[in-house]
Amino acid sequence: MHYRDLPEYTDDDFQHIDLIPFDWVHFEARDGSETTRMIRRIRESRLDLPCSVEVEKPRPGIEAVFAGATLLIFSRAYAGHHEFDTPHPFLLRMREQALQADLIVTWGNEGAYGLDRRRAIHHSPAYPPIEVKDTLGAGDTFNAGLIDAYIRGLGMAEALPHACRLAGNKCGQIGLEGLGGDIATKPG
């Protein structure tokens, strides 16, 4: 459920969470200063805990979150705001701001592109369903597919097609019930 008037989660809220049981933490980058403080807390208490950040829109101070992330997921709109109309140059520019992170940019019907920490470029095509039934949550489903693949120890070459297939499956059904099926156990 999406509710626009819900207040943003703050670092004060985040301080009450015990990070020990978590395998991964994911943020949507909305408030740069709050998200940066939360990521800093993760890095101070659980250096081993992977942390991903989705960056959809340009927002004041958002680039500050890049330094602490393990995985950065950008939108094509964000790349376009920075005057990039192709994914590779955008990813290379973002690499300058986030040397430690794997970088992903979604590119609509072309799928998604990535630049891993070894500077290897990866691509997965989109996997559109035969019939589009519901796109609500497809982006979050893509993110979940990436995180799922990474948690299972897969690299970007496997994670990108896994996430693209999962997002395509989501668009081909209404809601999230039963999403994945075989794809949940067989990435790529």
List PLM regions with ranges.
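Ribokinase/PfkB-type carbohydrate-kinase core domain
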Residues: 1-121
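Conserved phosphate-binding/catalytic region of the ribokinase-like
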Residues: 87-188
